[in-house]
């Protein structure tokens, strides 16, 4: 049974309503976490698993809480702290690249005290995959997924993003040729 770290961050409400933003975020999380995961998974060879979701539980109307649960196999506190720093920087770059993060606590590594089943927790922060459905307030979620499998909804949005990028390049080339 894989073990997970769960991160949460305040994100602009637009991520909830815009499909391309949500699936772009999922793809970016996978790309960023893969480098972290590869370092801790050298000898185990277990596929990276993830669950990305949006919770409707938010203290303000201009932000939603994005929750990212990622496979993590290194149980040392120093490794957990390093992973937390990496994900904090990732969230800040993805949502707040202009530099204005929300006031107050906008990012956190979830303690596993929300899971009442002691068989599904390890230490203070790690949870087993059976605990993920117990997290309340999901407005939207990918569900538990593995990086070794291609999911149709993720593939659809990655193709659309690629097609738009190619169309923009084609348009630039046509403008250069005609101008």
From Swiss-Prot:
Output the superkingdom of the source species. Viruses
Taken from the record, one Pfam family name reads DUF5506
Protein name as catalogued? Uncharacterized protein ORF17
Q: Please report the organism this UniProt entry assigns to the protein.
A: Fowl adenovirus A serotype 1 (strain CELO / Phelps)
């Amino acid at each position: 049974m894989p073990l997970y770290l769960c991160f949460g961050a305040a994100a602009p409400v637009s991520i909830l309503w815009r499909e391309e933003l949500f699936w772009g975020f999922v793809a970016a999380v996978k790309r960023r976490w893969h480098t972290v995961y590869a370092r801790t998974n050298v000898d185990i060879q277990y596929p990276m698993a993830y669950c990305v979701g949006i919770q409707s539980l938010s203290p303000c109307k201009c932000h939603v809480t994005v929750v990212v649960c990622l496979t993590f196999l290194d149980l040392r506190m120093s490794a957990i702290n390093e992973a937390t720093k990496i994900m904090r920087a990732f969230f800040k770059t993805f949502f707040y690249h202009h530099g204005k993060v929300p006031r107050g606590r906008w990012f956190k590594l979830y303690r596993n005290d929300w899971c009442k089943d002691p068989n599904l927790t390890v230490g203070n922060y790690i949870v087993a995959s059976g605990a993920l459905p117990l997290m309340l307030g999901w407005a939207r979620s990918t569900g538990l997924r593995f990086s070794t499998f291609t999911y149709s909804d993720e593939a659809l949005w990655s193709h659309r993003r690629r097609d738009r990028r190619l169309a923009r390049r084609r348009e630039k080339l046509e403008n250069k040729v005609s101008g």
